[in-house]
């Protein structure tokens, strides 16, 4: 799974808000947004299967990334977005060396097939599809310091957004199909011996609920997310993780987005999340911050006249 799939950020237009592909916000036609996002996460304890433990041989594992993100409004109801992160991972103890480099490029299409309002309520349905694939030849079989899993992913997501005045609730469900990957050895053992360098990667399901406050200049949300690998196996005792492990996690978090009144088009973003339970995953706490700018490819008057 690439970092981009979980953290790709793009920008809206009607209210000029940064968003993830999980957000119920769309750009206007002919608007383009670009910006950078910084993410920091670390963990010391992790789950070896269901056993929670630490490992003094690696100490604290830290991951950082800087992503460039872009989003374009093809129409008011159809957006295309892309992102590419540079990632560097390291541990505070032991002999494992730092891993860094460009990870996976990601492209998504976001579409509103249906929306309806009644009284002060509004319900909007979204369909999102995309893919991610590695752009560099990074080492896959060096977890937990590998910068990515190395698979090409096809992602499908359905989402429903409910809004009453400034209160919102958004629920989404995603299915991620992952290609097989090749590692730098001719055999490996999961629950049995495989005399090949090709690893069968299990698919992934991802669910999220986000709810909070959405206004013209501010969005504040609480998030509950669940990542479930649909297959795989547990890390064996005192062994390193493997790309096809059964990696599950439940995360809680917050998301804040602020549009500056005195600088139209500029948006600031901040967020945090914490893993509360997991399987074959580190108990990570993460923080992110970013800045984005929105502008029209065509004049605003031209874009508005096209809606008449």
Protein language model regions, located:
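Outer-membrane beta-barrel architecture
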Residues: 29-35, 79, 83, 102, ...
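Outer-membrane pore/translocation modules
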Residues: 96-200
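Short loop/turn motifs that connect adjacent beta-strands in outer-membrane beta-barrel proteins
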Residues: 22-30, 77, 115-124, 166, ...
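Surface-exposed strand-loop-strand hairpins of Gram-negative outer-membrane beta-barrel proteins
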Residues: 40-65, 144-146
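Residues on the lipid-exposed face of transmembrane beta-strands in outer-membrane beta-barrel proteins
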Residues: 36-38, 68-72, 82, 107-111, ...
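Residues that define the transmembrane beta-barrel architecture of outer-membrane proteins
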Residues: 30, 62-66, 100-105, 123, ...
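Outer membrane beta-barrel transmembrane domains
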Residues: 47-49, 54-56, 193-308
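Transmembrane beta-strands of outer-membrane beta-barrel pores
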Residues: 38-44, 84-90, 113, 131-137, ...
């Amino acid at each position: 799974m690439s970092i981009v799939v979980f953290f790709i950020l793009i920008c809206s237009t009607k209210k000029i808000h940064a968003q993830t592909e999980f957000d119920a916000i769309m750009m206007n036609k002919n608007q383009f947004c670009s910006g950078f996002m910084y993410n920091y996460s670390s963990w010391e304890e992790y789950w070896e299967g269901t056993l929670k433990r630490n490992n003094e041989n690696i100490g604290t594992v830290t991951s950082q990334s800087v992503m460039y993100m872009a989003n374009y409004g093809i129409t008011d109801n159809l957006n295309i977005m892309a992102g590419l992160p540079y990632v560097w991972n390291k541990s505070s103890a032991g002999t494992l060396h730092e891993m860094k480099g460009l990870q996976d490029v990601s492209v998504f299409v976001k579409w509103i097939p249906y929306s309806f309002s009644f009284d002060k309520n509004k319900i909007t349905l979204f369909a999102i599809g995309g893919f991610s694939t590695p752009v560099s030849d990074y080492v896959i079989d060096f977890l937990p310091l590998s910068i990515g899993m190395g698979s090409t992913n096809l992602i499908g997501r359905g989402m429903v957004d409910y809004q009453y005045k400034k209160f919102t609730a958004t629920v989404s469900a995603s299915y991620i199909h992952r290609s097989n990957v090749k590692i730098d050895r001719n055999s490996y053992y999961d629950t049995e011996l495989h005399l090949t360098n090709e690893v069968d990667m299990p698919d992934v399901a991802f669910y999220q609920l986000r709810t909070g406050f959405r206004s013209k200049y501010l969005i504040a949300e609480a998030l509950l997310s669940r990542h479930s690998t649909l297959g795989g196996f547990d890390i064996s005792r005192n062994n390193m993780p493997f790309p096809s492990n059964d990696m599950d996690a439940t995360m809680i978090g917050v998301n804040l987005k602020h549009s500056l009144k005195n600088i139209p088009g500029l948006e600031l973003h901040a967020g945090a999340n914490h893993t509360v339970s997991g399987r074959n995953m580190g108990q990570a706490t993460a923080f992110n911050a970013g800045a984005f700018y929105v502008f029209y490819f065509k004049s605003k008057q031209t874009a508005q006249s096209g809606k008449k």
